[in-house]
UniProtKB/Swiss-Prot annotation:
Gene Ontology MF term list: succinate dehydrogenase activity
Record keywords: Cell inner membrane, Cell membrane, Membrane, Transmembrane, Transmembrane helix
Entry protein name: Fumarate reductase subunit C
SUPFAM superfamilies in the record: Fumarate reductase respiratory complex transmembrane subunits
Function, in words: Anchors the catalytic components of the fumarate reductase complex to the cell membrane, binds quinones.
Gene symbol of the encoding locus: frdC
Signal peptide segment: none
Alphabetical list of InterPro entries matching this protein: Fumarate_red_C, SQR/QFR_C/D
Domain of life: Bacteria
């Protein structure tokens, strides 16, 4: 065994703030935090739906709280931001060819947003 001390590079907690790519990545990944709260709110809502009308009304009153509405709006914005970054990466990860030619990246991204809009419309009609 060697008595030499291995070199350990110092790393500050804020290492990711120095580079725009990593800063963007950390912000993108942080969008999951309000989504966790949104998911918990919905899970509690399902539980209150099972418990009865009084519990359901209590949950509806809770969901009408301005703080909860703000959290839900932040979760929606985070979801849209996450989707936009995912959709913009998709043509680079999976290039689509039609007739031997690459499909323009903008068309692929717009097609994904059109699919989101269509599915959202279907859900709004059904619900």
């Amino acid at each position: 065994m060697s008595n030499r001390k291995p070199y350990v590079r110092e790393m500050k907690r804020t290492w990711w703030k120095d580079h725009p790519f990593y800063r963007f990545y950390m912000v993108r990944e942080a969008t999951v935090l309000p989504l966790i709260l949104f998911t918990l709110f919905l899970t509690v809502g399902l539980g209150s739906l099972v418990k009865g009308p009084e519990a359901w009304q209590t949950w509806l009153d809770f969901m009408a709280n301005p703080l909860v509405i703000a959290i839900n709006l932040v979760a929606l914005a985070g979801s849209l931001f996450h989707a936009q970054t995912f959709f913009s990466m998709m043509p680079q990860v999976v290039p689509i060819r039609l007739g031997g030619k690459l499909v323009d990246k903008k068309i692929i991204v717009l097609a994904q947003w059109a699919a989101v809009a269509f599915i959202s419309l279907i859900v709004l009609i059904v619900v």
